[in-house]
Amino acid sequence: MIGVVLALAVIGGLGYAGARLLSRTSGGSGGTTSSPSPLLPGAPTVAVAPREPAASAPGVGYDISYPQCGRTAPRPAAFGIVGVNGGAPLTSNKCFAAQFAWARTLSARAVYITTSWSGTGDPVAYGEKLVTDAIEREHAAGVSGVSMWWLDVELGNTWNGTQQENATVLAAMAAKLQAAGVRVGIYSSPQQWAEIAGDWQPGLPVWNAIGPGTRARAIASCGEEFAGSTSGLVQWVAKKGARVLDHNEICPAWKNRAGDLLDVS
């Protein structure tokens, strides 16, 4: 994840917008009291996938990406989630192939891609472009067949439009991935999601980032909801030995639904 203004902490793979940042988006013209649709007209439909067969992936997993290039992947690990991009859309994590090879040795895995909105052009076309590019980068690294993709939605990414435009970009990305035959989830936090995407509630699985903290605090956040879903995965940033890493665990209510959150062996 990329660093931006104020105290945005970049630790581990996805990282976390640790400080409360003021929203850089607006939800429509000033003075209006109406509640506009959370998506622009013509936005694609995002489907809520049927449940996968019962599966579990107990224990702590890790997400890694370009910040961990050249470093040994964490073990033991219950599962691994690897970033395709190099901190921004339309860029490559140059260690993706090696890092995903690590994830394939684990009982479950997934990938994530960076989201943003440039503020110019068609939000739907822009979102679809980001997905097409990410899939091409995945294949260029010799990786294919990953069935679970997460959209990284953070204030540290570029958001140069309204919440309605932002949400439409995200809808286009999710729908494009679903058309490619994969399952989709949202990585964010309740605060960040509200500031970026407003009231849009697609009902996709969500991965809740609490930032620096403890496992106990992360598990306590499992009841939090955003984007129309209760937290399925939680992430906390902490030391593992001498290293600071993004730790992740499946929430208790989802303990037998690992297949809805990860690509389970």
Give the label of every model feature segment.
Residues 12-43:
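C-terminal region of N-terminal signal peptides and the immediate post-cleavage residues
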Residues 1-7:
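N-terminal export and membrane-targeting signals
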Residues 39-74, 201-265:
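Functionally critical loop-and-helix segments that line ligand-binding/catalytic clefts
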Residues 48-182:
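Substrate-binding cleft of extracellular glycoside hydrolase catalytic domains
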Residues 67, 115, 190-192, 239:
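Short, solvent-exposed coil/turn elements at secondary-structure transition points
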